[in-house]
Amino acid sequence: MKEILITNDDGYESEGLKKLIKMLTKEFKAKITIVAPASEKSACSHSITLTKPLRFVKVGKRFYKLDDGTPADCVYLALHALYKKRLPDLVISGINKGANVGEDITYSGTCAGAMEAVLQGIPAIALSQFYKKSEKELDYKNALQITKKIIQNIFDKGFPLEKKEFLNINFPAKSKIKGIKICKAGKRVYNFEAHSNVNPRGVEYYWLAAANLDFEDEKNSDIALLKKGYATITPIMLDLTAYERMKKVKKWLKANDE
């Protein structure tokens, strides 16, 4: 029997997580464990908690919330505390409410859950559902169908990537999708705002907000294809070295020494 570990960054009560658990329980004969943050941890990136203890709080059969933990905490502690005899065959992070595309990947707690898994040697996928602000309820039907297909492929054929690589998968908001595209991550144009105010004690504070997020016009990027109605799959690697720039930096450093 396969073993699956699930986490997310929207918290243990999120709709996307509930829908994912229901589908996996119905479609796969697998031992499923869920460890999710006790509260929403969106945009927490790959942070881990080093300054205080964390505890598992059981909320169901093999279902735990991690008190004030991040997605990376959830995966790391689950692997080291809950899996004594055998590690999971797959870690799934999601389904996130909102896309994780372009450089958003570096901010994403959803993607960080998958990152932590592959750092620990476990194949992983990150799942995110794009939606429009006008939508009152998210339709996860397409996301669940595609996720089922991808997981079945992984179990039947093995994971398609090397070590320390994961699949970042995004689903479009449209009810009828055009298909699935393997593509590169796009490039965001960021514009963050810092709103200042004063609390009742007279102390100034700031509240960050993302405003007018846009993207560069790249025809075959995850962002562009997602907006056209395609589900996108982007292989992500954790090797951050800019190899093509190493010679340039070496020459630059040598020139500075002369």
Curated annotation (Swiss-Prot):
* Class of enzymatic activity (EC top level): hydrolase
Q: Which UniProt keywords apply?
A: Cytoplasm, Hydrolase, Metal-binding, Nucleotide-binding
Q: How is the cofactor bound?
A: Binds 1 divalent metal cation per subunit.
Q: What is its main location?
A: cytoplasm
UniProt xrefs under Pfam families = SurE
Do you know which InterPro entries this protein is assigned to? SurE, SurE-like_Pase/nucleotidase, SurE-like_sf
What does UniProt give as GO cellular component? cytoplasm
Subcellular localization, as worded in the UniProt entry? Cytoplasm
**Enzymatic reactions:** a ribonucleoside 5'-phosphate + H2O = a ribonucleoside + phosphate
Q: Which domain of life is it from?
A: Bacteria
Q: Which cofactor does it need?
A: a divalent metal cation
**Any idea of its EC number?**
3.1.3.5
Q: Where does a divalent metal cation bind?
A: D9, D10, S42, N96
Q: Does this UniProt record's set of keywords contain Hydrolase?
A: yes
Which NCBIfam families does this UniProt record tie to the protein? PRK00346.1-4 (NF001490), PRK00346.2-4 (NF001494), surE (TIGR00087)
What is the role of this chain?
Answer: Nucleotidase that shows phosphatase activity on nucleoside 5'-monophosphates.
Which family does the record claim for this protein?
Belongs to the SurE nucleotidase family.
Q: What is this protein called?
A: 5'-nucleotidase SurE
Lineage of the native species?
Answer: Bacteria, Pseudomonadati, Campylobacterota, Epsilonproteobacteria, Campylobacterales
